[in-house]
């Protein structure tokens, strides 16, 4: 029975959709665009119009009038004609739809939609106009809608109003609760492509024991190896290990987490998959068949990668997927060769990487700028168990340091807060013997830096330690190296720095990048979708910072961090990479991820209420920290204003069942292996919510930008950021030492990442360092001003955007100040990674909202 009284009035609606084949990878012609195919649901515009009109039905749901305790449901109506709108984006189509209305129905607050077509389509939005006594209502949908038979309950979408649970209009409350229940699922069964279910699982999908022991990997999470949780797929288990999940070509994601928009990063991500499945095997064949030489002979040959390129086998391109980003990297120009763009670190000065100043500068303005710590004791001690590992007290002595302390003693330098350390020792020692049992050969490293009067850092000494040949309990075998600038000793010192950088490169990729951003954020994505309604204010605050994260993480588990994947092949830690990240996760602290807390914990800043950001930097010219504090403050101010708009008291927050369930599940399940840690916020005050939300947004946006988009600009020159070491340091009197004296460049290259691994590494990090054409950056949102109907948050968000623009101008001015030497360095590459905005491509700047690549 039609629930309306008078049927005379109409509500006009406009629905915007995208068809499935818009996101077909074969229709993409470049990293930025699509082929115009006269896009319609099934081909021609006429077909699309008739088809859509009869196959998609919609029912409005009242937010103000109830029927049986739930909002009244209107009569089903179909899409009508296709219309043209000036606001339509690429591949988008608009249709009009009319709804009958009377005053007994009230104001619409949601709608049901059914798709009776064979194919799914992407629903962008619905706008209802001229609603009596109300005006216009916006529904921002951004969701795939499959044939209705694939769903147990009808698909529902809510208007862009924002409500705490206690403020939800009574007719919508049950719909709100039911929709949350739908996306939680029941924890059983294998997930299907059209599912929208968010649930948790451990990392039991990295290996494939059925293919042999070489491919078996331990389960991470819920065991002695703690780990954040990932999305559950429900796939079956392997034959050999009932705890490991069977590999599959299809990796389930809740449908709207994958390809939910025309985004070239989807294809950047597919590029990574192509490197793993196509490029890697073909390159391996080329090297194994001696078509390509195994080693670089000198630094000039490395430079040729960017100037002339490497000639490829004649059939190379026919064997790799026709993915635009891959085509772009394997530039043919009529010939089959591999040529990379010159990385920024060598664009001005090809040998800047060899200087001590650049080596030191990159600890505070490079790829891994959040590891360096202050030295507060001397000699440096170890936290390793002495019974198991012997005495690991650092053997760097005063005699190694004081000649270069500018007249200070070590004690005075420590007192004046002038000594810093890059410490890659304790976490590596338990795995070092296993790592060195393969073709890789390396050391645990400790590097001491001195803060000079001109504000720059300089390395004073490097300790290289390897396991004692008679056993771990005897302690390490260690040597100390100090700077040298002439003869063979200059190359010994260059090698010592290379061992440090190899450790730093591994720690960066697997800990600072993968673990501390990608893996850490995934449980937040899952918990937010399971426990916070789409109309909850905190859902709307955090949602933009999750875009594409689960998608890129699932691809990473399949091609990057999986057993025998790209990371294991091209980074020193090899098969132990993910296991080591689990060991390091044990000591991860959520509250320390707030930038001011991180800086204070590492001793590179001290709390100072009179300082602009509440902390004073001890290395005043610390580009990552000084720029980051500007961004951190802007994020926190925006979050503070937003939270205060919706929660007028701590009591309101305490009584919010969705918020409390969200935080409880995040801590106890999502990061459940650390649930008993005392540092978790209790989520009893608005201040705790502001801090937790700001930390999450910081991790997903600025922290990820700082450790990701410099990968190619710094690491694209393998000489600057080697990822593997293959030989130990040559000892005096040995043939290797003599060879180093005669041909230092060749011997250096024999020690670091080999040619095959270099080509794979560069191909991947060039993709990872790119921005997509339709990326959303911090201070921007998809949907323009329609993500909420509340004017207060909309105005606050605009102020946030303006603040970020001001910060960017300030950072640009800073980079013009030549007295700030750490911003520029010998490589003459200003620190731009925390500029909020960017164009598409390889830009060395820009803070996307989310971890999208």
Curated annotation (Swiss-Prot):
What EC numbers are recorded for this enzyme? 1.13.11.58
What lineage does UniProt assign to this protein's organism? Eukaryota, Viridiplantae, Streptophyta, Embryophyta, Tracheophyta
| Cofactor(s) needed by this chain | Fe cation
What is the superkingdom listed in this entry's lineage? Answer: Eukaryota
Q: Where in the cell is it found?
A: Cytoplasm
Report the GO molecular function annotations. Answer: linoleate 9S-lipoxygenase activity; metal ion binding; oxidoreductase activity, acting on single donors with incorporation of molecular oxygen, incorporation of two atoms of oxygen
Q: What does the induction field say?
A: By pod removal and methyl jasmonate.
Q: What role does this protein play?
A: Plant lipoxygenase may be involved in a number of diverse aspects of plant physiology including growth and development, pest resistance, and senescence or responses to wounding. It catalyzes the hydroperoxidation of lipids containing a cis,cis-1,4-pentadiene structure.
Instruction: Identify the coding gene.
Output: LOX1.5
Task: Name the pathway.
Answer: Lipid metabolism; oxylipin biosynthesis
What does the UniProt cofactor note say?
Binds 1 Fe cation per subunit. Iron is tightly bound.
Q: In which tissues is it expressed?
A: Found in maturing and developing seeds. In young seedlings it is found in cotyledons, hypocotyls, roots and primary leaves.
Among InterPro entries, the record links this protein to:
LipOase, LipOase_C, LipOase_C_sf, LipOase_CS, LipOase_Fe_BS, LipOase_plant, Lipoxy_PLAT/LH2, Lipoxygenase_dom_3
Give the SUPFAM superfamilies listed for this entry: Lipase/lipooxygenase domain (PLAT/LH2 domain) (SSF49723), Lipoxigenase (SSF48484)
Main localization of the protein described in the UniProt heading: cytoplasm
* Binding of Fe cation, residues: 513, 518, 704, 708, 853
Catalytic activity from the UniProt record: (9Z,12Z)-octadecadienoate + O2 = (9S)-hydroperoxy-(10E,12Z)-octadecadienoate
Question: Where is the segment annotated Disordered?
Answer: 213-250
Task: Return the SMART domains for the record.
Answer: LH2 (SM00308)
Q: Which UniProt keywords apply?
A: Cytoplasm, Dioxygenase, Fatty acid biosynthesis, Fatty acid metabolism, Iron, Lipid biosynthesis, Lipid metabolism, Metal-binding, Oxidoreductase, Oxylipin biosynthesis
PLAT domain: which residues? Answer: 34-159
Domain named Lipoxygenase is located at: 162-853
Example GO CC term: the record gives:
cytoplasm
BP terms from Gene Ontology: fatty acid biosynthetic process; lipid oxidation; oxylipin biosynthetic process
Protein family membership: Belongs to the lipoxygenase family.
Q: How does it assemble?
A: Monomer.
List compositional bias (Basic and acidic residues) regions by residue number. Answer: 228-250
Name listed for the protein in its UniProt record: Linoleate 9S-lipoxygenase-4
């Amino acid at each position: 029975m039609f629930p309306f009284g008078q049927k005379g009035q109409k509500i006009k609606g406009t629905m915007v959709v995208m068809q499935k084949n818009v996101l077909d990878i074969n229709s993409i012609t470049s990293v930025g665009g699509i082929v115009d195919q006269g896009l319609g649901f099934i081909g021609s515009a006429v077909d699309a119009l008739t088809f859509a009109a009869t196959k998609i039905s919609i029912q409005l749901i009242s937010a103000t009038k109830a029927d049986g305790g739930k909002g009244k449901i209107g009569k089903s109506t179909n899409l009508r004609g296709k219309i043209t709108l000036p606001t339509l984006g690429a591949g988008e189509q608009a249709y009009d739809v009319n709804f009958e209305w009377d005053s007994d129905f009230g104001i619409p607050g949601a709608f049901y939609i059914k798709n009776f077509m064979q194919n799914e389509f992407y629903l962008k939005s619905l706008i209802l106009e001229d609603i009596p006594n109300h005006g216009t209502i916006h529904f921002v949908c951004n969701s795939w809608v499959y044939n209705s038979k694939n769903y147990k309950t009808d698909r529902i979408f809510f208007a862009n109003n924002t409500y705490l649970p206690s403020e939800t209009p009574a007719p919508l409350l049950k719909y709100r609760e039911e929709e949350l229940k739908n996306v939680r699922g029941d924890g059983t069964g294998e997930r299907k492509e059209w599912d929208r279910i968010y649930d948790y699982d451990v990392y039991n999908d990295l290996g494939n024991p059925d293919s042999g022991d070489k491919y078996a990997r331990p389960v991470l999470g819920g065991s002695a190896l703690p780990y954040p949780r990932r999305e559950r797929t429900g796939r079956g288990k392997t034959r050999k290990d009932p705890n490991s999940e069977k590999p599959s070509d299809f990796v389930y994601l809740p449908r709207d987490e994958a390809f939910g928009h025309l985004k070239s990063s989807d294809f950047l991500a597919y590029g990574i998959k192509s490197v793993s499945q196509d490029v890697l095997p073909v390159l391996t064949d080329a090297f194994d068949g001696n078509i390509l030489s195994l080693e670089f002979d000198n630094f000039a040959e490395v430079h040729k990668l960017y100037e002339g390129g490497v000639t490829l086998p004649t059939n190379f391109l026919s064997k790799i997927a026709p993915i635009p980003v891959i085509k772009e990297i394997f530039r043919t120009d009529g010939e089959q060769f591999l040529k990379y763009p010159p990385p920024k670190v060598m664009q001005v000065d090809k040998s800047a990487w060899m200087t001590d100043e650049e080596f030191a500068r990159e600890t505070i303005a490079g790829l891994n700028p959040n590891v360096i710590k202050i030295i507060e004791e001397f000699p440096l001690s170890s936290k390793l168990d002495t019974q198991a590992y012997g005495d690991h007290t650092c053997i760097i002595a005063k005699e190694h340091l004081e000649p270069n302390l500018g007249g200070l003693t070590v004690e005075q330098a420590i007192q004046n807060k002038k000594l810093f350390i890059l410490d890659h020792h304790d976490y590596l020692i338990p795995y070092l013997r296993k790592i060195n049992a393969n073709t890789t050969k390396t050391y645990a490293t400790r590097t001491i830096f001195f803060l000079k009067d001109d504000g720059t850092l300089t390395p004073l000494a490097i300790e290289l330690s390897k396991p004692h040949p008679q056993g771990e309990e005897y302690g390490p075998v260690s040597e100390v190296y100090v700077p040298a600038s002439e003869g063979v000793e200059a190359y010994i010192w260059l090698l010592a720095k290379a061992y440090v950088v190899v450790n730093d490169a591994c720690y960066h990729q697997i800990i600072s990048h993968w673990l501390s951003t990608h893996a850490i954020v995934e449980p937040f994505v899952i918990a937010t979708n399971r426990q916070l309604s789409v109309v909850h204010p905190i859902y709307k605050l955090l949602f933009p910072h999750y875009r594409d994260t689960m998608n890129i993480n699932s691809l990473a588990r399949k091609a990057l961090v999986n057993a025998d994947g790209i990371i294991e092949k091209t980074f020193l830690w090899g098969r132990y990479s993910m296991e080591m990240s689990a060991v390091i996760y044990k000591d991860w602290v959520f509250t320390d991820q707030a930038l001011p807390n991180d800086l204070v914990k590492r001793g590179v800043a001290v709390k100072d209420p009179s300082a602009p950001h509440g902390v004073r930097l001890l290395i005043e010219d610390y580009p990552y920290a000084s720029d980051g504090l500007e961004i951190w403050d802007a994020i926190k101010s925006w979050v503070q204003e937003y939270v205060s708009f919706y929660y007028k008291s701590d009591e309101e927050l305490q009584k919010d069942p969705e918020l409390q369930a969200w935080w409880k599940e995040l801590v106890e399940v999502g990061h459940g292996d650390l649930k008993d840690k005392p540092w978790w916020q209790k989520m009893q005050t608005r201040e705790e919510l502001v801090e937790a939300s700001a930390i999450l947004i910081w991790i997903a946006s600025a922290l990820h930008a700082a450790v990701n988009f410099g990968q190619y600009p710094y690491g694209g020159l393998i000489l600057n950021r080697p990822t593997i070491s293959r030989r130990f340091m040559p000892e005096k009197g040995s043939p290797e030492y003599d060879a180093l004296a005669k041909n230092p460049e060749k011997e250096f290259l024999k020690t670091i990442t080999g040619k095959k691994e270099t080509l794979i590494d560069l191909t991947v990090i060039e993709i990872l360092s790119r921005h997509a054409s339709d990326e959303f950056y911090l201070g921007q949102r998809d949907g323009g001003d329609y993500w909420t109907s509340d004017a207060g948050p909309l105005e606050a968000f605009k102020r946030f955007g303006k603040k970020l623009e001001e910060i960017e101008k300030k950072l640009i001015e800073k980079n013009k100040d030549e007295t700030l030497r750490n911003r520029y360095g010998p490589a003459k590459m200003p620190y731009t990674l925390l500029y909020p905005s960017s164009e598409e491509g390889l830009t060395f700047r820009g803070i996307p909202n989310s971890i999208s690549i």
